[in-house]
């Protein structure tokens, strides 16, 4: 064990290298806030939603692949924003990323869409044909009995 490792200086050097690779202290704090981890890896590819997929085999197997969602999503990310081909790569179902080896396309497969029920303005609300049984009282109005 070297003196550098014993004093922990190698950890400080590794952290400094990560800060440099990520793009500065501000970028590290932003990534730490969004992902709860400060990871550095090679960009494997991106999809049509703007997600960026990374891999670093220095981490152990379930955590060596990850996705970074675009800034427009911020903290409102959802698992449905990851297309199926990238999902299979993230979960080690396939070894090759879709950017390297695209999966075969079928005529009957629809294009992937994210779940829109998380957005209030795009949420599906069925039309109701029944009257409400309970009506809220508004001050200053006479009650209406049918």
Swiss-Prot record:
The UniProt entry lists membrane topology as: Peripheral membrane protein
Q: Which UniProt keywords apply?
A: Electron transport, Membrane, Mitochondrion, Mitochondrion inner membrane, Respiratory chain, Transport
A GO cellular component annotation here is: respiratory chain complex I
Subcellular location, in the record's words?
A: Mitochondrion inner membrane
Fetch the InterPro entries from UniProt: NDUFA12
Asked if Membrane is a keyword of the record, the answer is: yes
Q: Does the keyword Cytoplasm apply?
A: no
Which domain of life does the protein's organism represent? Answer: Eukaryota
- Which Pfam families does the UniProt record give? NDUFA12 (PF05071)
Which function does this protein serve?
Accessory subunit of the mitochondrial membrane respiratory chain NADH dehydrogenase (Complex I), that is believed not to be involved in catalysis. Complex I functions in the transfer of electrons from NADH to the respiratory chain. The immediate electron acceptor for the enzyme is believed to be ubiquinone.
Subunit details: Complex I is composed of 45 different subunits.
The record's similarity note reads: Belongs to the complex I NDUFA12 subunit family.
Put simply, this protein is called Probable NADH dehydrogenase [ubiquinone] 1 alpha subcomplex subunit 12
What taxonomic lineage is listed for the species of origin? Eukaryota, Metazoa, Ecdysozoa, Nematoda, Chromadorea
């Amino acid at each position: 064990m070297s003196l550098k490792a014993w004093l922990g200086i190698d950890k400080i050097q590794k952290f400094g290298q990560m800060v440099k690779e990520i793009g500065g202290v501000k970028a590290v704090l932003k990534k730490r806030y969004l992902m709860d981890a400060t990871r550095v890896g090679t960009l494997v590819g991106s999809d049509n939603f703007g997600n960026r997929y990374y891999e670093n085999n220095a981490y152990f197997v379930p955590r060596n692949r990850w996705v970074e969602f675009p800034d427009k999503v911020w903290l409102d990310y959802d698992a449905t924003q990851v297309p199926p081909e990238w999902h299979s790569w993230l979960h080690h179902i396939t070894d090759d990323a879709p950017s390297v080896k695209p999966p075969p396309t079928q005529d009957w497969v629809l294009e992937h869409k994210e779940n829109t029920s998380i957005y209030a303005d795009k949420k599906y609300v069925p039309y109701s044909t029944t009257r409400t049984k309970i009506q809220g009282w508004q001050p200053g109005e006479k009650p209406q009995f049918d």
